[in-house]
Amino acid sequence: MLDRIRVVLVNTSHPGNIGGAARAMKNMGLSQLVLVQPESFPHGDAVARASGATDILDAARVVDTLEEALSGCSVVLGTSARDRRIPWPLLDPRECATTCLEHLEANGEVALVFGREYAGLTNEELQRCQFHVHIPSDPEFGSLNLAAAVQVLTYEVRMAWLAAQGKPTKMEKFESTSMLNTELVTADELELYYAHLERTLIDIGFLDPEKPRHLMSRLRRLYGRSAISKLEMNILRGILTETQKVARGLSYKRSDD
């Protein structure tokens, strides 16, 4: 199960931190490491800091974009230490672990995303995350080393996984009582939906592309905190398609007859 959690490091500048993150992952039973445009990898410092977790480094995927790194994920959790203009669902590490387990029990793929050592994740990158995770360190000295942050979250995930052995999760209970298809949408499917939604809002005159303000960011937050199933996504996409037909004066399926 833990092999469906990917640790995503974005634009890491120090290769030693990649090695330290790999060691933290292997300590806690995780194996998927994805690197988005690392400044220097592979590198001897990464191997040295991995301290025996070189199999994690050897299997690491290097990609050009965060979108590639998140492809196929049903939930994306991004670490953030800064206040943002638009509030977002914020979890502590323990809540993050619980959320991970619920999606794993639903056969989803999970991504834990960590930003640059000097600046973290950008606002645009954080908007690709359904949840933001904050490690409540001492505010007088709150900056954590990247590998240490990976260790904190992967430890909590492992503890939640151990505690859940033999016990039904909230997601399992939901599945046992629901008639709906509960296979969750992936991060890339959500991105396609957001693009479709934006085009539709422009078509009906609700969104001015010249003055978008924060509308799409707020809508991302709204949908991001919901566990949307593939069936529900099909319904939402169908509604948008029919709305676009009406806006463009085309024939559409529904009628009042």
UniProtKB/Swiss-Prot annotation:
Disruption phenotype: Inactivation of the gene abolishes Cm, Um and Am formation in tRNA. Mutant has increased sensitivity to hydrogen peroxide (H(2)O(2)), with reduced expression of oxyR-recG, katB-ankB, and katE. It is found in: Cytoplasm. One of its GO terms (biological process) is tRNA nucleoside ribose methylation. Keywords: Cytoplasm, Methyltransferase, S-adenosyl-L-methionine, Transferase, tRNA processing. Belongs to the class IV-like SAM-binding methyltransferase superfamily. RNA methyltransferase TrmH family. Homodimer. This is tRNA (cytidine/uridine/adenosine-2'-O-)-methyltransferase TrmJ. It comes from Pseudomonas aeruginosa (strain UCBPP-PA14).
